[in-house]
Amino acid sequence: MALAKRIIPCLDVDNGRVVKGVKFENIRDAGDPVEIARRYDEQGADEITFLDITASVDGRDTTLHTVERMASQVFIPLTVGGGVRTVQDIRNLLNAGADKVSINTAAVFNPEFVGEAAQHFGSQCIVVAIDAKKVSGPGEAPRWEIFTHGGRKPTGLDAVEWAKKMEGLGAGEILLTSMDQDGMKNGFDLGVTRAISDALGIPVIASGGVGNLQHLADGIIEGHASAVLAASIFHFGEYTVPEAKAYMAQRGIVVR
């Protein structure tokens, strides 16, 4: 029996409001995170991912408060990320009601933090978020590099090798965003999604670029992802989660 593939709406939250940009810029307001999360829960989303994109020191308490409000009203798994740097940050988020915590930049600067987090809390609640950009030229073997700081800073790290290293340290899941595709609405980068999904034994969540329901199905069928994440197609009412599930089921994908 094939494992059901998950559909995960993503809330990018800036100072307590859900926003959506293109390639991490041109941000527009999409509403109150708790209201939006509740709507997705009612629609039958499998999980919700909440990424605090301000993640500044002053934004921390707002975030914990929002997570508490969300967890009290939403009864599907909640992954929270953004500015997670210490074991205490993870503990605070789990105590506030997060089911999983996503580590991004901190993993690049201190890979051992991922191992420490997995030992403390178990791999099942540690997600490593990877922002990858294609760096190979025409005619070269495809290669993707990890970028940090919202896609602004190159790290020199190969995305596939890095993902394998994170799995080895105890990450339970990889949240893979294509920086080239983010907000462009012309589909996931299926090359990097497939390369990383095929290299790992843990689930990979495809993110960045969904513009229609076909793209969600492609992430699973062609990208070999375990789950697909989308924001703007759901936030702005173009499609609903039930429509996405019905479409994927028609394509022969097992959904919950």
From Swiss-Prot:
E.C. designation(s): 4.3.2.10
Family designation: Belongs to the HisA/HisF family.
Protein name: Imidazole glycerol phosphate synthase subunit HisF
Organism: Pseudomonas fluorescens (strain ATCC BAA-477 / NRRL B-23932 / Pf-5)
UniProt xrefs under InterPro entries: Aldolase_TIM, His_biosynth, HisF, IGPS_HisA/HisF, RibuloseP-bd_barrel
Biological process, per Gene Ontology: L-histidine biosynthetic process
Subcellular location: Cytoplasm
Listed GO CC annotations: cytoplasm
Described function: IGPS catalyzes the conversion of PRFAR and glutamine to IGP, AICAR and glutamate. The HisF subunit catalyzes the cyclization activity that produces IGP and AICAR from PRFAR using the ammonia provided by the HisH subunit.
Pfam families assigned to the protein according to its UniProt record, in alphabetical order: His_biosynth (PF00977)
Catalytic residues (UniProt): D12, D131
NCBIfam families found in the cross-reference section: hisF
Involved pathway(s): Amino-acid biosynthesis; L-histidine biosynthesis; L-histidine from 5-phospho-alpha-D-ribose 1-diphosphate: step 5/9
